[in-house]
Amino acid sequence: QNGFSQDDLEVLAGITGQAGKAVEQATAHDEKVAQEQFKRDLELANRVQQGLLPSVPPEIKGFEVFDFYEAAHQIGGDYFSYIPLGENRLAVVLADVSGKGVSAALVMAALSADVRYTLAIEADVAKAVTLLNSSFMRSGWDDRFATFVVVVLDSTSDVVKVVSAGHLPTYLRKADGSVETVGLEEAGLPLGVDPTFVYEAAEVNMIAGSTIVLYTDGISEAMNHKNETYGLTRLQEVLSEPADSPAAVGRRVLVDVERHAAGQVRSDDMCLVCVGRPAST
């Protein structure tokens, strides 16, 4: 004998059933609350990300600037900015933080502030990126890293300085349509990989009609319905086509990427910056 009558067992069964339903309802409620909180966090992260991006291209004597940014459905860590460095100089910055979601957006926001600080206190752009990398490592972002590239323009000089920290190749489109990779030998590791790494700057002579092209992997890795990436070869081919301004170069790239993707849902933010010298008239 277990001490329970049939009536007792029926009552216990009823209580158990009610308790089970109560637990299910509580779990469903908790999940709904968690989903709503996650949605609010994503919306906040998206607003933070959008607030850090430039609203219009800058003006700097002797240069024309075109930019494009479009967020993917998932929040990513793409970031670009224009940072004045005194009366005649301007830094064009582009970065891609590893990962997605709220945490990537937070790392991007911190990196954005750090970039402005290091470029403000260190005039030598290569040394500034070396300081930036050390700061990134000290921040303790676990296994996060960021690819990064900065181009420093000077309205009093034809020489442009480029420092790349593991970012995708920087391209120089010359006035004759030829395309070359900039700073391949000087390119360094991504930020957050080696705290002792020392970065180097490449120098590029930009004459009238030439354009420097910066982009994130939302461009180069855009997928079509066959799961084929857009790729760097196709990008270089499009860059070599006739174009009379940085805006024309940029729009031609965007049209071709869209043609390739043909409406496929993107998983990465798409960022493109083209900086050029006006063509001689």
Predicted regions and their residues:
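N-terminal membrane-insertion helices
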Residues: 12-16, 167, 250
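… and, occasionally, acidic/histidine-rich disordered N-termini of signaling adaptors
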Residues: 29, 33-213, 259-281
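Amphipathic alpha-helical "output/dimerization" segments
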Residues: 3-24, 109-110, 207-208
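Short, charged, surface-exposed loops that flank catalytic or proteolytic processing sites
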Residues: 122-128, 241-250
